[in-house]
């Protein structure tokens, strides 16, 4: 069975200009399946539109949203959308959220009701059905980590912590797990090696770094003697990058190889929408241009 060419996105954070750019790009590159690792909402000013698109693309019976003009032939493969810590906070009580993040969650909770009663119910039903983790025949998917799918951060310094690495990889039943949450793209190997993509001089003009063979157990047809240790891949953030690069980040995966995609989008438009909502702190707009 051929693995569907998959676009893996995370941490959209109610940023429609970034998400639209990412989705159009993924379709143009031939993506037939969409996996969202959570945090569709939070921080940004357009949670309803971001949810609308995920409720059509990242589901078991996906379809192309009518207001997303893309060229696509054939049928989409079943997608997946997971719960991030911001969805969890929205459905419960924000825990360990700073005041700015908490303000955005409280505003988002009210905003979801502004599209009408029926649509509001649809949003809450979708959010209530989100799973904390998922998997297919090749890969696992989580927002935070394999150990704590919703809340745990995995960051580059963790590659120097053998005990944490062992605990992170222990629950894995596949050769690779894709995560988000930290908003910093990277590949963490079980033996402590780390790869942090630098999508600049090594990047083609189209904003892609890769493809890179994961070479991990259970992916593709890599000979056994060439297989690398298992890997955790952070796909970065579409809506609020935090690695010093304001360009959106996502990953393409064909079952064996990954490519990191970094793209410019209309940061000013996304920021202006946040500035236009008095309940959202200006800082949430200002940070977008800094990639922090």
Predicted regions and their residues:
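Short, glycine/charged-enriched secondary-structure capping and boundary segments
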Residues: 21-24, 49-52, 95-98, 155-156, ...
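Beta-strand-turn-beta hairpins that frame and shape the catalytic cleft
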Residues: 2-6, 134-141, 226-232
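N-terminal active-site segment of His-dependent metallophosphoesterases
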Residues: 1-59, 65-70
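Active-site neighborhood of divalent metal-dependent phosphoester bond hydrolases
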Residues: 56-148, 152-173
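Active-site environment of divalent metal-dependent phosphoester hydrolases
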Residues: 13-18, 42-45, 86-91, 147-149, ...
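Acidic, His/Gly-rich catalytic cores of divalent-metal-dependent hydrolytic chemistry
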Residues: 190-292
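Active-site neighborhood of phospho(di)ester-bond hydrolases with catalytic His/Asp-centered motifs
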Residues: 9-10, 34-38, 43, 80-85, ...
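Glycine-rich phosphate-binding loop signature in dinucleotide/nucleotide-binding domains
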Residues: 26-31, 136, 170-173, 226-227, ...
């Amino acid at each position: 069975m051929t693995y569907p060419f998959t676009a893996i996105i995370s941490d959209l954070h109610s940023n429609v200009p970034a998400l639209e750019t990412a989705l159009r790009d993924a379709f143009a590159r031939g993506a037939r399946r969409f996996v969202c690792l959570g945090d569709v909402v939070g921080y940004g000013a357009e949670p309803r539109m971001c949810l609308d698109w995920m409720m059509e693309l990242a589901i078991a019976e996906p379809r192309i949203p009518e207001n997303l003009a893309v060229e696509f032939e054939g049928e989409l493969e079943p997608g997946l959308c997971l719960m991030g810590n911001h969805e969890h906070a929205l459905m419960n009580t924000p825990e360990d959220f700073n005041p700015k993040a908490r303000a955005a969650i409280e505003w988002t909770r009210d905003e979801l009701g502004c599209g009408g009663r029926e649509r509001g119910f649809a949003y809450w039903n979708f959010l209530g059905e989100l799973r904390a983790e998922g998997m297919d025949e090749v890969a696992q998917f989580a927002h935070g980590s394999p150990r704590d799918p919703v809340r745990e951060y995995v960051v580059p310094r963790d590659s120097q912590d053998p005990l944490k690495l062992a605990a992170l990889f222990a629950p894995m039943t596949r050769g690779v797990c894709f995560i988000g949450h930290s908003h910093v793209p990277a590949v963490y190997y079980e033996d402590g090696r780390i790869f942090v993509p630098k999508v600049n001089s090594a990047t083609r003009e189209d904003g892609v770094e890769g493809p890179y063979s994961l070479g991990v157990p259970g992916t593709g047809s890599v000979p056994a003697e060439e297989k690398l240790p298992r890997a955790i891949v952070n796909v970065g953030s579409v809506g609020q990058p935090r690695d010093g690069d304001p360009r959106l980040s996502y990953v393409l995966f064909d079952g064996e190889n990954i490519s990191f995609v970094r793209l410019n989008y209309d940061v000013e438009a996304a920021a202006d929408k946040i500035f236009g909502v008095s309940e959202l702190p200006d800082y949430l707009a200002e940070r977008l241009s800094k990639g922090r």
